[in-house]
């Protein structure tokens, strides 16, 4: 059987940037790593409430923890006069067990949330929990992603679908999805839907096209110009027609 690697981890350091960016010595590395995991787990629980698509963590030498939160609803994330940010900062300090932790949360708006695999997967999971059709939920997500400009999308739902005794997996695939091509910008997310029949697994792959360097872009533009159809010029007197011979 083929072993399927996580598309995000497969591309980190090549076409995708790491979510955690900092440097630490051997004495601090383990503690920083544990803190990052606690921060990610904290925001994972608030994905549906705040429509969080991605979280990135950066640290500087002064001990400042910069947390970039990409959300589809920045107004809900900020709250009135930034009250939600203050509350989130206090909650993080409690989780990290450090009331003096210097934490700065930066909210960034997702311009196209329908291209974010995490938000699409959560949307499918919410519909499944509300007893919606797993087929329609996937089709709506595919339609929304393609309309937003995705080159391709793949979805998968596994578990006791419709409450049957035998668990199975059903999914849809539309457009291009080159998982083996590292130049292909693929966003992947997996989540779970808690239904009365049990837990269903939801996976979403979104392809945003290939990431090309400047040289590759120039070559691609040249090829597009060469392959472009030439304008058909009509000669004077109109187009030529097949002449009929007179008997």
Curated annotation (Swiss-Prot):
GO BP terms in the entry: translation
InterPro entries referenced in this protein's UniProt entry, alphabetically: KH_dom, KH_dom-like_a/b, KH_dom_type_2, KH_sf_prok-type, Ribosomal_S3_C_sf, Ribosomal_uS3_bac-typ, Ribosomal_uS3_C, Ribosomal_uS3_CS
Bias (Basic and acidic residues) ranges: 236-247
CDD domains found in the cross-reference section: KH-II_30S_S3
Entry keyword Chaperone: no
Residue ranges of the region described as Disordered: 221-247
Molecular function terms from GO: mRNA binding; rRNA binding; structural constituent of ribosome
Source species, domain of life: Bacteria
SUPFAM superfamilies hit by this protein: Prokaryotic type KH domain (KH-domain type II) (SSF54814), Ribosomal protein S3 C-terminal domain (SSF54821)
GO CC field: cytosolic small ribosomal subunit
Residue ranges of every copy of the KH type-2 domain listed in the record: 39-111
Key words of the record: Ribonucleoprotein, Ribosomal protein, RNA-binding, rRNA-binding
NCBIfam families: rpsC_bact
Function field: Binds the lower part of the 30S subunit head. Binds mRNA in the 70S ribosome, positioning it for translation.
HAMAP family, sorted: Ribosomal_uS3_B (MF_01309_B)
Assembly description: Part of the 30S ribosomal subunit. Forms a tight complex with proteins S10 and S14.
Protein name: Small ribosomal subunit protein uS3
Organism name: Metamycoplasma arthritidis (strain 158L3-1) (Mycoplasma arthritidis)
Taxonomic lineage: Bacteria, Bacillati, Mycoplasmatota, Mycoplasmoidales, Metamycoplasmataceae
Gene behind the chain: rpsC
């Amino acid at each position: 059987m083929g072993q399927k690697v996580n598309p995000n981890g497969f591309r980190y350091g090549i076409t995708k940037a790491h979510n955690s960016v900092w440097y630490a010595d051997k004495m601090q590395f383990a503690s920083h790593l544990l803190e990052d995991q606690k921060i990610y787990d904290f925001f994972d629980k608030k994905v549906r409430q705040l429509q969080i698509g991605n979280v990135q963590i950066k640290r500087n030498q002064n001990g400042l923890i910069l947390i970039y939160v990409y959300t589809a609803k920045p107004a809900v994330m900020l709250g009135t006069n930034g009250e939600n940010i203050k509350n989130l900062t206090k909650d993080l300090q409690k989780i990290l067990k450090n009331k003096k932790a210097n934490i700065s949360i930066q909210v960034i708006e997702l311009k196209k949330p329908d291209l974010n695999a995490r938000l699409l997967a959560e949307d499918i999971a919410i519909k499944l929990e509300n007893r919606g059709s797993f087929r329609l939920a996937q089709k709506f997500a595919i339609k929304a992603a393609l309309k937003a400009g995705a080159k391709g999308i793949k979805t998968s739902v596994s578990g006791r679908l419709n409450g049957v005794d035998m668990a199975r997996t059903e999914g849809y695939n539309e457009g291009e999805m080159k998982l083996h091509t590292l130049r292909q910008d693929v966003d992947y997310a997996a989540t779970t839907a808690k239904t009365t029949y049990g837990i269903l697994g939801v996976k979403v792959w979104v392809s945003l096209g290939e990431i090309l360097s400047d040289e590759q872009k120039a070559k691609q533009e040249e090829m597009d110009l060469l392959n472009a159809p030439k304008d058909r010029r009509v000669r004077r007197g109109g187009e030529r027609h097949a002449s009929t011979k007179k008997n």
